[in-house]
A protein has these predicted regions:
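Short helix-initiation/N-cap motifs at beta->coil->alpha
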Residues: 63-74, 201-216, 255
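A ligand-binding cleft/hinge motif common to bilobed small-molecule-binding domains
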Residues: 85-99, 191-195, 219-220, 224-245
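An extracytoplasmic/periplasmic, membrane-proximal ligand-sensing/linker region
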Residues: 29-48, 263, 267-323
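Bacterial signal peptide processing site
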Residues: 22-24
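A bilobed periplasmic-binding-protein/Venus flytrap-type ligand-binding module shared by bacterial periplasmic
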Residues: 35, 115-127, 256-270
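A conserved helix-loop-strand patch within extracytoplasmic ligand-binding domains
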Residues: 107-185
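Short beta-strand->loop
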Residues: 100-111, 201-204, 237-255
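C-terminal motif of bacterial Sec signal peptides marking the signal peptidase cleavage site
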Residues: 16-20
């Protein structure tokens, strides 16, 4: 084995089964995931989920910890896992490489996807109207938006919207971009700019790490346009309260999918349906379950509305940047 796929997590039936999974072994399920929780609390965090699923399905359910998202795909392909909870790119790879079936999508803040936001400190150039204030509910704070991307009192963050305004970016524009592996900070923005006729290689790229630093760069005058998740300004309000008005959101890219849950292709259909239903209902099953789900994988829910086309589109963008 070229690398260690899983980290051991001790008790609570969290050992890795090295035997190949198959349709005849549906009396036991192994779930691979990359949890938010680290260290000694890991077994405690996984236990309630695996115990709940065992009770709902009537089969033994084990949880194993993958070293990273790519390792969840390796585990599924190697027959070391039946179910993976992973990010959108790994879902796409599992579907393409191992014919995995997508059964659930991750829900964060009530949504299965999010847009990359184009921010600016120069609304005179990028806004066709006066910026308006709309409430970003997750932070219970009003933020500035323009170009009609938020017509209501409460922001929704739904894209695409006003992407044509990216065409105002010229070769002398300082554009703040994050790592080339960042969907919201680089990949989707670059595709959107290129579709609007912007030669990204010609702009003055300002590299930063993290969505917080992307919007802070605008607040500090280090760039004119920046990209980040919706709404990155909320992450720096305490250190820079004026960022809610000084940095304006002026466009949304197409939606970027959250991750989800996929299963091996030969899983018994009845068990697969029961698994999807049980996981879909988990967050609502108890207050403890909701807390465990947030602490374990940073989610508020799962949903059976898989919107597979968003995952496939994400795969296209990944392939574009792998050339």
């Amino acid at each position: 084995m070229k690398k260690q796929i899983f980290a051991a997590v001790g008790a609570v039936a969290l050992t890795l089964s090295l035997t190949a999974c198959g349709a005849a072994e549906d009396d036991k399920l192994t779930i691979s995931l990359v949890p938010s929780t680290e260290g000694e609390d890991l077994a405690e965090a996984l236990g309630p989920l695996t115990e709940y699923l065992s009770e709902q399905l009537g089969v033994e359910v084990e949880g194993v910890v993958a070293s990273d998202y790519a390792a969840t795909v390796e585990a599924l392909g190697a027959g070391q896992s039946d179910v993976i909870i992973t990010d959108a790119g790994s879902l796409y790879n599992a579907m393409e490489q191992h014919n995995a079936e997508l059964i659930l999508r991750d829900v964060r803040f009530g949504a299965t996807s999010y847009s990359s936001v184009a921010y600016t400190n120069n609304p005179d150039k990028y806004c066709d109207d006066e910026p308006v204030m709309a409430t970003y509910a997750a932070a219970d704070t009003e933020m500035a938006y323009c170009n009609g991307i938020e017509p209501g009192d409460t922001a929704t963050g739904e894209g695409p919207a006003a992407v044509e305004k990216l065409g105002e970016i010229t070769s002398d524009t300082s554009v703040v971009l994050q790592s080339s592996t960042s969907p919201a900070g680089y990949q989707y923005p670059v595709v959107a700019m290129e579709e609007e006729g912007v030669n990204v290689d010609d702009v003055n790229q300002i590299p930063v790490e993290g969505n917080n630093n992307a919007v802070l760069a605008l607040a500090n005058g280090d760039g004119e346009v920046a990209f980040g998740f919706w709404d990155a300004r909320s992450s720096v309000i305490e250190e820079n309260p004026d960022i809610t008005t000084d940095v304006v959101a002026f466009a949304y890219t197409e939606q970027i999918p959250n991750g989800g849950v996929a299963v091996r292709s030969d899983m018994d259909p009845e068990l697969k349906d029961k698994l999807a239903e049980a996981m879909d209902n988990y967050a609502e099953s108890s207050d403890e379950a909701a807390d465990v789900m947030y602490d374990l994988v940073g989610l508020s829910d799962w949903t059976a509305e898989t919107q597979e086309e968003e995952i496939n589109r994400y795969g296209e963008i990944l392939e574009y940047f792998s050339k």
